[in-house]
Design a protein with these regions (language model features):
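Extended, charge-enriched "interface" segments that sit outside catalytic cores
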Residues: 2-81, 359-365, 369, 427, ...
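Gly-rich Lys/Arg/Thr-decorated short loops/hinges at beta-loop-alpha junctions or inter-strand turns
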Residues: 51-61, 117-122, 311-312
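Glycine-rich phosphate/diphosphate-binding loops that line cofactor/substrate pockets in enzymes
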Residues: 51-52, 72-85, 138-147, 264-275, ...
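Glycine-rich phosphate-binding loops that contact phosphosugars or nucleotide phosphates
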Residues: 78-252, 443, 447
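Short beta-alpha connecting loops at secondary-structure transitions
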Residues: 122, 205-212, 315, 367-372, ...
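Active-site phosphate/pyrophosphate-binding segments
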Residues: 175-344, 349-352, 437-475
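Helicase-primase coupling helices
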Residues: 313, 319-406
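C-terminal helical cap and adjacent loop that interface with cofactors, partners, or active-site loops
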Residues: 386-449
């Protein structure tokens, strides 16, 4: 793997050998099939390139255009580290999954349990659900008097986040009185929505979510960068990594653009009935990257109408697994179940720790042979074993290798997935940046709660007309 001169670490690598017919045989994808999509791929590339920084492609410029914002983030993060013992993100979807994934990847795997002097930052929690027991449990382990809350919602109208805002602001007012607003930092849209109004009324420190940056594409803006910086992560290196991947993808030739090749292969695989993509990192540090990817891929590509209004019902279903854990729960399905999956393994070339396996149990050959080896060797051997089992069973798989896990390679990986998703949307001729199915659920939820706005009253009337439920089908 070549070094990336921008982020000063080796480039991440996409290995699609086990997707191709040259390795997999008749169940693999031929170079002729890739060539047949050459024009469509070039068009997808050109459409994304032509709209860089415009509309909902504003995220494509995030690696380059945030110097003043980054300086403000770093200054504010340093102040938070000095003043607070705990940092809590209030958000959901992209406002939570990205910060969780980056924290897990780039900090100690038991970060919160470390003594303060070893952490180098406040304890870190992300409240990405509204389970009442979880909320009560958080109050049991934090002291709001020494906690900073980062409220993240671009629209300012996200019910889950704003309900949490109400709960914690009430608690803060009771605990610290007039100083409560000093414990709130908001990340929201610039000129519309409830949260920006509350921010101005109360004088909260705040960051702006740029126009053209949707939640699932927002990790490289203050949504993701500020929580990362608070916990001591090098956000400049993350952005350099993203820029490195962006530079690698400046070609309409699939053989010169890894994100474009990935989009083409997943498109062909889906056309062949591979309607599921299982993302399987072989590293606990990357466990939540799979969660983040699942939202990105599902919410962007799961659509029922094309850009020109034709019904389509497209979208490959993403799912997650963890190597080696899920070899013992899901691999049986992957190797002998339906031919409907692509397995995307994520490999780490060099872990940040090496753990040796001691010699012992010499009377048991199946145990003794492990002595003198390392867990590093064992986890890679098991990954290779899984790769071979999938190959032997005629199942498509691919491997993304991070030579090491650091801010630069994480920036590369996340930008790679984002760009792949944008290209895939072009190949499918759908809008990869809206989520009307989510909006329907949101409106129905607000109607159930009795929101009196006109559109919710109309939804209440609509929902009242649905078929009555029968006791016959309740057991």
């Amino acid at each position: 793997m070549e070094d990336c001169k921008m982020c000063m670490v080796p480039q991440i690598q996409l290995d699609v050998n086990h997707m191709m017919s040259a390795t997999l045989g008749e169940r693999g994808i031929s170079e002729q099939e890739v060539a047949a999509l050459r024009d469509a791929a070039e068009k997808a590339y050109e459409n994304v390139r032509a709209h860089r920084g415009q509309g909902w492609l504003g995220w494509t410029e995030l690696p380059y255009n945030q110097e003043a914002v980054i300086a403000d983030i770093e200054k504010t993060a340093a102040e938070v580290r000095k003043q607070f013992d705990t940092f809590v993100v209030l958000g959901i979807g992209g406002s939570a999954l990205g910060p969780i994934a980056v924290q897990q990847a780039l900090n100690h795997l038991h970060y919160n349990e470390l003594p303060a002097e070893k952490r180098g930052g406040p304890r870190f929690y992300v409240e990405d659900n509204i389970d009442p027991e979880r909320m009560a449990a958080l109050f049991d382990v934090i002291d709001v008097k020494t906690t900073c809350f980062n409220v993240i919602t671009k629209s300012g109208g996200t019910a889950e986040t704003m309900s949490q805002y109400l709960i914690f602001t009430d608690a803060l007012k009771k605990a610290v009185g007039d100083d409560w607003a000093k414990h709130i930092i908001t990340t929201t849209g610039a000129d519309r929505g409830n949260l920006i109004k509350l921010t101005r009324e109360n004088g909260f420190k705040h960051f702006i979510v740029p126009d053209g940056v949707g939640g699932r594409y927002s990790e490289m803006c203050p949504v993701g960068l500020f929580p990362a910086a608070v916990c001591g992560i090098n956000i400049r290196a993350m952005l350099k990594g993203a820029a490195c991947m962006d530079k690698r993808c400046q070609s309409g030739d699939v053989w010169q653009n890894p994100a474009l090749m990935e989009a083409v292969l997943q498109y062909i695989a889906t056309e062949r009935g591979m309607n599921v993509q299982a993302v399987m990192p072989y590293a606990d540090s990357l466990k939540y990257m799979a969660d983040w990817f699942c939202q990105l891929w599902a919410e962007s590509l799961g659509k029922n109408v094309t850009r020109d209004g034709k019904p389509c019902n497209v979208g490959q279903t993403p799912t997650k697994a963890l190597g080696v854990t899920d070899q013992h729960s899901q691999l049986q399905l992957y190797t002998e179940g339906p031919y409907d999956k692509v397995i995307t393994m994520i490999k780490v070339g060099a872990f940040r720790s090496t753990v040796e396996i001691p010699h012992g149990c010499e009377e048991f050959h199946d145990v003794a042979f492990l002595g003198g080896k390392t867990l590093n060797q064992l986890i890679e051997a098991e990954r290779q074993g899984t790769e071979y089992a999938l190959l032997k069973a005629g199942r498509m798989s691919q491997t993304i290798t991070l030579p090491c896990v650091n801010a630069g390679t994480i920036g590369q990986l996340m930008y790679f997935f984002e760009l792949t998703t944008a290209y895939e949307g072009e190949l499918l001729n759908i809008d990869a940046f809206n989520q009307p199915g989510v909006e329907e659920s949101k409106v129905a939820s607000y109607a159930v709660l009795g929101n009196e706005a006109e559109k919710y009253r109309a939804k209440q009337e609509e929902m009242a007309k649905r078929p009555a439920l029968s006791d016959k089908y309740i057991f």
